[in-house]
Amino acid sequence: MFGVSAGSENREEYFAGLARRFASDAKMFRCRAAVHVENKDDVVFWSTVLKHFCPDDRFHFLAGSRNEFGHETSGVTQCLKYVHALGPDFFICIDSDYRYLLHERGIDAKHFILQTYTYSFENHHCYAEGLDEVCSRIAHVPNRLFDFKRFLTCFSRIVYELFIWHLYFLRTDPVRFSKYDFNQYINMTSRESLISVCDNGHRVLEELEMKVKRKLAYFERKYPNAALENIRKKYEQMGLLPETTYLFLRGHNVYD
């Protein structure tokens, strides 16, 4: 019988019971541990990561599980319901979203939670240094049509300062420049701005830069005393630089 009563203790015990069962299943399958990921699309990515660091071990992956109401559920919220039941035999792997940048407590390997550090696993697939290799492997010819590294570096530099403002407002006034608003500003998939291979995306980057500069000018006029330099230094230590911004943005904005 699935489902539990409303009390938080009952919910914790319910998920602790599932965790024990998953760990037991992993042992039965002769795996080192059971691993709950957000959904089935994440399995390949995390399987590759764990294979790299634990080449001699096998893992039992779960792309979803039953929530407290008995419904089969996936996603990061479902993963995080197990936080009180994690250990070396059962752990979770999630997309960081902004959890890494905003120092969300308890989201680390010490608490048996692995994260992407980038916004999501899609950002890793967009890593500039590897895209040429992917194209060459698929097309069986060297990629000389589009310079991914140059495009993503230019894109990152254009949106970097706006992203700093976005992170600033997430701390001080989240409604002022929300995730939705920011993602709309950096969106490059409009019909009027199709990326051209011929000019290495120059036109779409120009249009994006004009849009971003207008928003930056508004923020600078409206909030002249915003202390951004400390924020830049703080995030620089975490790997957020003008050239690497694309790794920390919403993955689908970059991936699409």
List each language-model region with its residue ranges:
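Acidic, divalent-metal-binding catalytic cores of TOPRIM
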Residues: 1-256
